[in-house]
């Protein structure tokens, strides 16, 4: 099934502070309905996922916004990006599933319109995963030192279902 709860883990890098990461359920909401009705118009399963994503962002110090490169930029991506910007958190737009795509530069230009730094990756093939951990660590505050177990600072991963959030965590 589709997870509606947050899944939490720890990113450990030799010689660097550990940091927590929160994988949220995939957000499937109709962007038009969200714009016209707002989150209070959403009910049931989708409401649970949205609440968990909101809670993850409130607890986080940064966001990895995961999008599916094969699908291109969708209205829901634009809605979520606007919402993330309102939260004011440092954000990296992770464009997953770019392996084998032609015109990658054009695709990245499309996502560049969201206004976040971009990193193309392929969680399935391990492309740019090491760079991803470095970029995510760079989003943490400069004075961050992991002295707590689990780490006090967390990064939230948001995006649509099947964008590859969990695959990146597991890579």
Language-model features and meaning:
Residues 89-92, 97-154:
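Canonical P-loop GTPase G-domain recognition
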Residues 80, 128-129, 163:
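Proteins enriched for Cys/Gly/acidic motifs involved in redox and nucleic-acid/cofactor modification
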Residues 42-47, 57-79, 88-105, 120, ...:
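Conserved Switch II/interswitch segment of TRAFAC-class P-loop GTPases
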Residues 1-59, 67, 110-113, 135-171:
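Conserved G1/Walker A P-loop phosphate-binding module
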Residues 12, 30, 75, 103, ...:
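Active-site-proximal flexible loops/turns
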């Amino acid at each position: 099934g589709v997870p509606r709860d947050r899944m939490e883990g720890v990113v450990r890098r030799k010689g660097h502070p550990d940091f927590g990461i929160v994988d949220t359920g995939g957000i499937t909401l109709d962007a038009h309905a969200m714009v016209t009705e707002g989150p209070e118009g959403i009910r049931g399963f989708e409401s649970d996922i949205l609440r968990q994503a909101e809670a993850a962002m409130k607890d986080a110090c940064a966001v990895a916004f995961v999008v599916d490169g094969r699908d291109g930029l969708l209205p829901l991506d634009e809605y979520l990006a606007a919402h993330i910007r309102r939260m004011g958190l440092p954000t990296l737009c992770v464009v997953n599933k770019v392996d084998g795509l032609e015109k990658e530069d054009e695709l990245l230009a499309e996502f560049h319109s969201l206004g976040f730094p971009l990193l193309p990756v392929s969680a399935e093939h391990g492309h740019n995963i090491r760079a991803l951990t470095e970029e995510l660590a760079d989003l943490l505050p400069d004075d961050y030192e992991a002295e707590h177990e689990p780490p006090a600072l967390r990064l939230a991963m948001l995006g649509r279902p099947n964008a590859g959030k969990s695959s990146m965590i597991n890579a």
